[in-house]
């Protein structure tokens, strides 16, 4: 059984396709989605989203929070990933991501949630891009 994935942001559809498995980081921990999964709604963390394609290779994206909604209808399992922003690994400029990380770290303080989120996103982008 496969999972039909739709990775979207408010601006665009980032990726759509069938996968064997989805691995996502929720705010309460990791979740794995296979075919015939029970309905589920998960709040996503700023983190990598991993999708195992039908040929066994992995497609990785970074998502900036959002939600993962899993539904099953007539034997079709669908995973809708609704993120504030998302990028596939091959779309990330590693040098630019490192520069953004350094900028965010320089602005970050213990009390600044926005800067902490920027640091988390920059770190996730670097991890995803390799």
Predicted regions and their residues:
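Compact, glycine-rich, soluble single-domain proteins
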Residues: 6-98
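Acidic/glycine-rich phosphate/pyrophosphate-binding loops and surrounding catalytic core
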Residues: 80, 86-130
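N-terminal export/targeting signal detector
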Residues: 1-4
């Amino acid at each position: 059984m496969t999972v039909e994935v739709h990775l979207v942001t408010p601006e665009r559809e980032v990726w759509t396709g069938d996968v064997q498995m989805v691995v996502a980081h929720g705010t309460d921990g990791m979740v794995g989605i296979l075919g015939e999964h029970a309905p589920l709604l998960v709040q996503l963390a700023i983190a990598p989203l991993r999708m195992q394609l039908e040929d066994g290779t992995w497609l990785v994206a970074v998502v900036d929070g959002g939600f993962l909604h899993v539904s099953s209808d007539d034997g079709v399992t669908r995973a809708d990933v609704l993120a504030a922003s998302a990028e596939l690994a091959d779309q990330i400029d590693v040098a630019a991501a490192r520069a953004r990380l350094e900028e965010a770290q320089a602005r970050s303080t213990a009390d600044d949630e926005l800067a902490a989120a920027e640091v988390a996103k920059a770190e996730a982008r670097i991890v995803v891009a390799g």
